[in-house]
Amino acid sequence: MVDVGKWPIFTLLSPQEAGSIRKACVFGTSANEAIYVTDNDEVFVFGLNYSNCLGTGDNQSTLVPKKLEALCGKKIKSLSYGSGPHVLLTTEDGVVYAWGHNGYSQLGNGTTNQGIAPVQVCTNLLIKQVIEVACGSHHSMALAADGELFAWGYNNCGQVGSGSTANQPTPRKVTNCLHTKRVVNIACGQTSSMAVLDSGEVYGWGYNGNGQLGLGNNGNQLTPVRVAALHGMCVNQIVCGYAHTLALTDEGLLYAWGANTYGQLGTGSKNNLLSPTQIMVEKERVIEIAACHSTHTSAAKTQGGHVYMWGQCRGQSVILPHLTHFCCTDDVFACFGTPAVSWRLLSVEHEDFLTVAESLKKEFDSPEIADLKFRIDGKYIHVHKAVLKIRCEHFRSMFQSYWNEDMKEVIEIDQFSYPVYRAFLQYLYTDTVDLPPEDAIGLLDLATSYCENRLKRLCQHIIKRGITVENAFSLFSAAVRYDAEDLEEFCFKFCINHLTEVTQTAAFWQMDGPLLKEFIAKASKCGAFKN
């Protein structure tokens, strides 16, 4: 859970103001500016207001939050900022707004005039639904839902990807080798740009003096170039620090390259790397990585919930990933980043909203006031009929007077294992699932049987994070069997991306005939067997 109170600037707010925050971002050269969205979708800013970056219509700093009427009710989805700073955001409707520093046309309005208030970025984006934005020091990028990528602003090193070093005053589609490809994730270093395709391929362009493009050399690139060293890897997240890059594959493997003056690559040395190198090899599967173009800090979160940090951490150079006591990567930047900015738009939850939920959680499997027990594999789980009836339609029907179970104090369960059924009952009390991917398959079966659609989605999420070459076909089979279309497509893509390896596994040869034929036919349609 993100706690905005860990950022010093938010201590200026009253408890009531801080308690209303649902989204937030801290930015600026010294982390002296902040923007936040309240639970009723009002947008406020406060801080130094350097280069009009607060968007209040004037250049006055303020310790008291000011409302940005132009953005209230817009439902901000993605937000990024530059070094000027300038601010760029997109709404849930895909509309892009920008304001602040504009000395290099990074606001995309065709001028170099400061943007004193939020203004919609229209050129080439008016008919696009933008789903993600990213900012470098003085350039900007916007990713559309159809996979098209647009860039503009400062272009001294080719970071806009236009093929020249002339500044780009308005959004321009990044073409060349990306022309017919679909981009799904973007990131900016200070003067470099990175993109991930739906195929898992990675492309980079712009400044490369520290090897941050991962091309094996340090020559700048004026147009996108594929990171060939990641061939065979399917990357699903990429982030950039000031002059280094981190990439996370669909197998939970972490790669780093670029500048390493502060140990931000986590290799155990301070030598720059011109090509991607795997780090955290001995650690458990990584599920999230974090970096920010304003800092030389890196962070990662593993499947077990452990958060690591390395690089420049409060003046120290941490050259290997260091295990922290934080629960999220955002806390690393709040407490150890220099400056203490946000690496992404924060999503905030508050414990005071969980009073009832926490009470229910405490009573799960507590025999004191329970009125029902489930017996699975010789073990008991204590529950409350009222809670089960409220939370699950299956139990609501079961505990009607005409069901035998309504009169029982102990119900025997033999079609599901103890860990699976316990996780299900615990979910009814906590709305969360805590299971390894292997057991999540059984829980997916239960969720399908009990028509618990949200539980199915949670199981699919766990399974996706635990997919490997060895279990990919087993998970694909389970997804088909339990009619989990999203999971089926995810597993299918994973199998295609690692086709040679997964076809050598036992799970592949254990697939039943009809399903195997269906897989081969589908793989053939997407060109998996072309020479």
UniProtKB/Swiss-Prot annotation:
**Keyword Oxidoreductase assigned:** no
Q: What is its main location?
A: nucleus
Places the protein is found: Nucleus
The record's Gene Ontology cellular component field reads: nucleus
Tissue specificity annotation: In the retina, mainly expressed in the inner retina with strong signals reaching up to the outer plexiform layer (at protein level).
GO BP, one annotated term: chromatin organization
- Keywords for this protein: Cell cycle, Chromatin regulator, Nucleus, Repeat, Transcription, Transcription regulation
The UniProt record lists the BTB domain at 370-437, 470-499
SMART domains attached here? BTB
- What residue spans do the RCC1 repeats cover? 40-91, 93-145, 147-198, 199-250, 252-302, 304-356
Q: What CDD domains does this protein's entry cite?
A: BACK_RCBTB1, BTB_POZ_RCBTB1_CLLD7
Q: What function does this protein fulfil? A: May be involved in cell cycle regulation by chromatin remodeling.
What PANTHER family does the record tag this protein with? Answer: BTK-BINDING PROTEIN-RELATED (PTHR22872), RCC1 AND BTB DOMAIN-CONTAINING PROTEIN 1 ISOFORM X1 (PTHR22872:SF4)
Q: What is this protein called?
A: RCC1 and BTB domain-containing protein 1
Q: What is the protein's species of origin?
A: Mus musculus
Species classification: Eukaryota, Metazoa, Chordata, Craniata, Vertebrata
